[in-house]
């Protein structure tokens, strides 16, 4: 069922698809799913959705005093799992599915702290730059600025580039985990039965300590088709072909809050 969801990209052979869930109002709700590369100890992408069940802000971020802060992912059953390296080679533990993306329940937020959801990110990139794009997506998908007015469902895929050597900056976690050279997002909006999409491609570097404006973030916009060309990942492939081909050509930042 996870592989047939709209947010789930096409997978690469040899990798492991993991999904985390919580019980919300008596129903099982997916926090996110991911494609984990067991050789590189890093996820190729994480995917999730904002909808009526998942857009609420009900709980705070997991308490940093709760140890381990970044536990091994129990869904890997210890196979090719990577334990946290506290030093992380000076990089931040960058959430792929952000903690602030999943605040609708305690379990859902805790699920975002597994090591499979972590990527080594430069501090200023994580805390000052990427976070602005994350905030925009949260505004579009959650119960805040736009509420449910922007999308009935907003599908999100995030990741860092780990497949090709020329898209890897280096290695962290005792040289076992690649540091992506680029990070990306692919978004699919469904509103009143109509589909639209946009994507973002961002070089992983230190952009300084001043948070960028949305006009600056807009410079990172690309179409989903362009992002597929950059990453080799087939996004939103579970859409009907005629819909997929149309929406994946789109890149209109003005209709996405920019």
Predicted stretch roles:
Residues 1-258:
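Domain-level detector for secreted/extracellular nuclease and nuclease-toxin modules, and
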């Amino acid at each position: 069922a996870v592989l047939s969801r709209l947010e789930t990209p096409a997978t690469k052979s040899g990798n492991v698809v993991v999904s985390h869930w919580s019980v919300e109002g008596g129903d099982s709700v997916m926090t996110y799913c991911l494609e984990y590369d067991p050789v590189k100890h890093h996820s190729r992408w994480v995917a999730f959705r904002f909808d009526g069940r998942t857009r609420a802000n009900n709980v705070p971020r997991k308490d940093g005093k709760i140890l381990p802060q970044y536990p091994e992912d129990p869904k890997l059953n210890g196979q090719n799992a990577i334990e946290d390296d506290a030093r992380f080679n000076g990089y931040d533990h960058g959430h792929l599915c952000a903690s602030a993306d999943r605040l609708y329940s305690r379990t859902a937020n805790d699920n975002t702290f597994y090591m499979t959801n972590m990527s080594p990110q430069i501090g200023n990139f994580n805390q000052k730059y990427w976070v602005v794009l994350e905030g925009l997506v949260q505004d579009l998908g959650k119960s805040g600025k736009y509420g449910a007015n922007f999308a009935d469902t907003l599908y999100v895929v995030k990741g860092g580039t780990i497949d090709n050597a020329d898209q890897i900056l280096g290695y962290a976690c005792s040289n076992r985990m690649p540091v992506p050279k680029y990070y990306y997002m692919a978004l699919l909006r469904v509103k009143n039965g109509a589909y639209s999409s946009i994507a973002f491609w961002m070089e992983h570097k230190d952009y300084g300590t001043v948070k960028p404006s949305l006009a600056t973030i807009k410079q990172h916009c690309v179409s989903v088709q362009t992002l597929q060309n950059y990453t080799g990942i087939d996004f939103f492939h579970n859409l009907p072909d005629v819909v997929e081909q149309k929406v994946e050509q789109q890149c209109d930042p003005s209709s996405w809050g920019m």
